[in-house]
C-alpha cells in the first residue's frame, strides 16, 4: 500500500513538519528533499491574516507575521524499521512578507530515491516501488511471489526451510512446483559414449555435497559391480548400475547351475541363491544311463546333464565291462540270452583243460592273447581223440562284482572239431589273428549305468536318453560331488566355495548400502533433534544423538539470536557409526 508525504503543525516543536508514510515493507526509503513548505505556510498565514482582520477590520495592510523558522523533520514509519537519509544543510524553510507586503516562500521539491517513483495528483504526492528493483542488499518479507496469470508461485519460509507453492492449486489441491535449470553435480553416465564400468565420487567437494540434487543427479547415482570377467582370473570393474537399471542374475548353464532371487523384509533385502544341478548315473541292462527313463514314473526331473561327483564316476566305471555267455554250439549247454558282465578289474582265468594247455600272453601294445594247445604228451586213441575236448564253464571271480547270468550255467564240453564261439558283447572287442584271439575292453565303452563303490548308497551314474542321472545305487538318492576344483573357463563346473563367495559378495554389498543408509538416517535424526536458542541476545551449544535400526548418529550445534531478536544463526556438525560426517549452516532474519 503506497503512502504520501503530509505536512502538519507540530505543537510540541512549534513548527511545521513533513511526515513520510511510505510502505513499511520497504527496507530502504527514498528521501524527500524539502526546500520550502509553501502550501502549509501559506495556509497558516492566511488563517493568521483572517484572525487579524476580525480584530482590525479597517486595516488594509497586514503587518508581516514573524514566525520561528520551520524545520523539516523526516520520520521513519510506525514500525521504526525505515532508514532516514541525512538531511542536507539549509533544509530549513520560512514564510514571510516581503517589503511590498506579499507572502513569499521557497519552493518544495519532492524527489523519488532509488527504486521509487512519485506521482502527483493535485496536492497529493504518491510514492510507489518501481517494477524493476536494483542494488538491493536485502529484502524482508513474509512471502515472495513470482509471475501471474495462473502461474504465480509463492515462496515462504518457516523453521523447516523454504516452501514453494502455486498460488492457484491444481488437481486434488496440488500446489507443488517444479524447479527447473538445476545443474548436475555427479559424473554424467547418461552420455552415449560407451559403457561406464566404474564411477567414484572422489571429485565431489564438501560444498558440492550441500547442493540441491537434480533429476539428472538421481539418474546418475548408482553402484559399481566388480568381479572376474570371462577369460580372466583377476577381479576387475565390470559395470556401473544407475538408478532404474535392471540387474539380472542368470545361470550361464541352466543344465548344471540354478539361480534363485528372493526379495525379503518388504523389499529391503534381496537374496541371490546359486546352486548346482546334479545328475545320477544308473545301470540298466548292463549299460550306464543317466537322467529319467522315458517310462519311469515318479517326480524325478533329472535330465542327465547335471553334475556328478568323482566317486559316482568311479562307481560307474567299476560297473563297466564286457558281457559274455556260453552258446549251445557243439552240443554244449548254452546260456541263451543271459550274459555275464565282466566288469572293470574283474579277473578272467583261462585254465588248461583235459588234453589242452592254455597260454595267456601280452604284447608290447598291451593286447592279451589266449592260446589253447593240445597236450601231445598224452597218448590218445581214436576214441579218446573223438571224445577229447575241453569243458567251458562260467563263474564269478571271488571277491569281485562279476556275476554269471542265469541260463546255461553248467559246464559244457567242447569236443574235437567242434567250434567254440567267443562272442564280443557290449564294450568288448575281439581280434582274431590266426590262432590268436585278442579280447579287450572297448576304448569307447557305452554303459547304461556305472556304480562307483559298493553298497546300496554307492553313487551310480546312469543315462536316460540324453540325460545323465547321478544318485545312490539303491534308491537313487541325491549324492554330493566333492573335491571339485574352482571353475576357470566358461562351461567349467562351479564349486560351492565359488558360489558362496559370489553370494557373500552380493550380501556384503547390499548390507553395506543398507548400513550406510541407516547410519545416514540416524545422523539426520540426531541433527533434527538439536535444540536452539529462542531468546534475543542468547546463544546455545547443543549436542544430540540418534539411532535407527542398529546404527547411531550424533550431532553438535551452535545457535545464536541477535540482541534485537531479528537475526538468527545456526550451524551443525554431525557424524554416524559408519564413519561418515556432515555439516550444515544457516542464517535467518525474523520480524
From Swiss-Prot:
| TM segment ranges | 537-547, 551-561, 570-576, 580-591
Q: Where is this region: Surface exposed passenger domain?
A: 52-503
Disruption-associated phenotype: Deletion of the gene decreases the ability to adhere to Chang epithelial cells.
Xref: SUPFAM superfamilies: Pili subunits (SSF54523), Trimeric adhesin (SSF101999)
Q: Which UniProt keywords apply?
A: Cell adhesion, Cell outer membrane, Membrane, Protein transport, Signal, Transmembrane, Transmembrane beta strand, Transport, Virulence
- What Pfam families does the database record attribute to this sequence? ESPR, Hia_Tpr_ring_dom, TAA-Trp-ring, YadA_anchor, YadA_stalk
Regarding domains, what does the record say?
The signal peptide, cleaved at the inner membrane, guides the autotransporter protein to the periplasmic space. Then, insertion of the C-terminal translocator domain in the outer membrane forms a hydrophilic pore for the translocation of the passenger domain to the bacterial cell surface.
Q: What is this protein called?
A: Autotransporter adhesin NhhA
